[in-house]
């Protein structure tokens, strides 16, 4: 256990987990007792954050888990569910990878400040920071700039730390003060500082120049002939940039390059970058936020391009949510952010793996 975990456990009169207990199922009394302080921290943080969002005037919503389209990002994989209609027709649905589409439909319907503690699902993901089923804390503000949800994210993270009484987040030898003023860093500046790459030179007019980035990164990461601009970008980000983020204090990494804009809108004054940010603590990504794109035609083009690449890579593509694209035409200007609730609880409680902070974690060999 980490020092924070040991301290938390000691306060509860709980002995550290033995190696034998680690291998036992989560439902054994001994292992549950070892995890209980983390689970109590989870409940306390959930209550505190719900109170904060209510005080801020947010409506807590509950959106559906079954979706006709689970999202249209190249490397996200969704579990599927085969249903049968009352008339016997076979229906294909997916478990959502995010509540984003549904929440934005609510913005189109007239909601202005909404939040959801959403159960979401990702196939092909498992590890100290990943589970196939986890909780996404997602919230949206209509008619506000994305700096508003940036500020929210910092407050939410500090609220979690204040709730458990932890003074410093720690993970894999890195520490961060959740109460300190965050470090604001553009993606372009981060690539210059940590990888000596002029990232903006590889996206003239917002268009990805694969060969330019490959040439700039050839001595930094292993590049294959099949790698796209986005693949190379991700390799540099993961290997050379992310390890430096959120050390000592939170880092807000913002102004993502246009090819990585996803559902974010372009920065009005510079089309090479998007109104997208991520928040890091101890090298761990906690939150991902957007100034929301509301151009349905542009979003359709992005989705189709992402699904073309998904089909090339993985031999499958997900359908577009035409209902969502129609709702986009009614959406107000908005901003939103998705925060990994389990990861936040992990850092705020001193746990070392997110399955320690989940009440019923899936077994390593599947549910």
Regions found by a protein language model. Name each.
Residues 75, 89, 111, 130-136, ...:
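A generic structural signal for well-ordered coil/turn residues at beta-strand boundaries
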Residues 142-145, 162, 196, 282, ...:
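Short, well-ordered loop/turn and helix-capping segments at boundaries between secondary-structure elements
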């Amino acid at each position: 256990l980490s020092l924070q975990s040991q301290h938390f456990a000691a306060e509860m009169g709980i002995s550290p987990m033995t190696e034998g207990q680690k291998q036992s199922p989560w439902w054994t009394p001994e292992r549950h007792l070892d995890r209980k302080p983390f689970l109590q921290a989870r409940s306390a943080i959930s209550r505190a954050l719900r109170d904060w969002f209510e005080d801020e005037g947010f409506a807590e919503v509950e959106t559906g888990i079954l979706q006709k389209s689970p999202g249209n990002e190249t490397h996200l994989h969704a579990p599927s569910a085969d249903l049968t209609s009352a008339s016997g027709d076979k229906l294909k649905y997916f478990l959502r990878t995010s509540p984003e589409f549904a929440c934005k439909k609510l913005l189109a319907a007239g909601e202005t400040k909404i939040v959801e503690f959403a159960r979401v699902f990702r196939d092909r993901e498992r590890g100290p920071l990943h589970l196939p089923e986890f909780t996404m804390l997602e919230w949206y503000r209509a008619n506000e700039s994305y700096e508003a949800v940036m500020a929210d994210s910092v407050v939410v993270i500090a609220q979690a730390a204040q709730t458990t009484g932890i003074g410093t987040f720690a993970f894999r030898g890195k520490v961060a003060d959740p109460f300190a003023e965050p470090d604001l860093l553009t993606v372009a500046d981060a690539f210059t500082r940590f990888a000596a790459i002029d990232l903006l030179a590889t996206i003239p007019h917002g268009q990805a120049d694969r060969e330019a980035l490959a040439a700039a990164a050839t001595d930094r990461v292993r590049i294959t002939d099949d790698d796209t601009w986005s693949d190379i970008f991700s390799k540099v980000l993961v290997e050379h940039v992310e390890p430096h983020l959120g050390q000592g204090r939170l880092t807000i990494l913002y102004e993502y390059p246009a090819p990585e804009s996803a559902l974010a809108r372009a920065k009005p004054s510079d089309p090479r970058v998007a109104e997208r940010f991520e928040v890091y603590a101890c090298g761990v990504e906690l939150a991902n936020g957007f100034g929301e794109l509301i151009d349905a035609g542009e979003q359709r083009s992005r989705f189709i391009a992402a699904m073309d690449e998904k089909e090339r890579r993985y031999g499958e593509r997900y359908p577009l949510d035409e209902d969502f694209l129609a709702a986009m035409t009614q959406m107000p200007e908005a901003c939103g952010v998705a925060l990994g609730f389990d990861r936040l609880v992990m850092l705020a409680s001193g746990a070392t793996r997110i399955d320690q902070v989940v009440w019923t974690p899936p077994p390593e060999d599947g549910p």
